[in-house]
Amino acid sequence: MLGSLDCTHFVWRMCPTELRGQYMRGDHQYPTVMLEAVASQDLWIWHAFCGPAGSQNDINVLQQSPLFLAQRNGTAPNCPFQVNNHLYKRGYYLTDGIYPTWSVFVKSFPYPHDPNEKKFKRQHEAARKDVERAFGVLKSKWGILNRPMRSKTVKKIRSIVYTCLILHNMIIKDDGRAIAPVHIQDPPVEPVFDDTAYTELIDEDTHWRLKHDLVEHLGSLDLPHLEVDSDEE
């Protein structure tokens, strides 16, 4: 697992009148700017993409995001892993139900029936809270992110958000809580766009097979805290 992927909103107080319709959504009372981020269990932010208008949903933001640019360019490092005796080429992200059924996304079951599916749902939802915790820590630690933004341009808001994210990671590293305290730079590779790489990314068959293998693997482990009580079934 590479981390948990999700989006959050920052209220834009000084949004120009002519842009308010573009940056507002029905479930938000004020104009907002979105942030897409990937966080791990130590709350380290591995990926951040800030700037999309608040009227968009997570899928629209994903289509603009550079999250999979390295994979499509053929410059991403290999990270194969094996689960349930099946070999997979790339790592995966934990997401909620709105994201597409790509090979690199693992989503929970909306209505699990099998006991193993119920255990998987519990574990998935518990692990995916990493990114929600990261957003909560960011907004509580940096008050400027929790209050309506007074900047007049998205460019300045983006700079503020990225600055807070960098400081957030620096604090985690300085406290010694980072899973990977040393960053090893990948060797430079000439970008080569590969159509097959994108096809592999969005492959639904791999998505469902990986999900099934993870359910079977989790079900084979002795994890009493994930057992479903008879009252909850």
Briefly describe each language-model feature range:
Residues 1-233:
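Short, well-ordered secondary-structure "scaffold" segments embedded in the functional core
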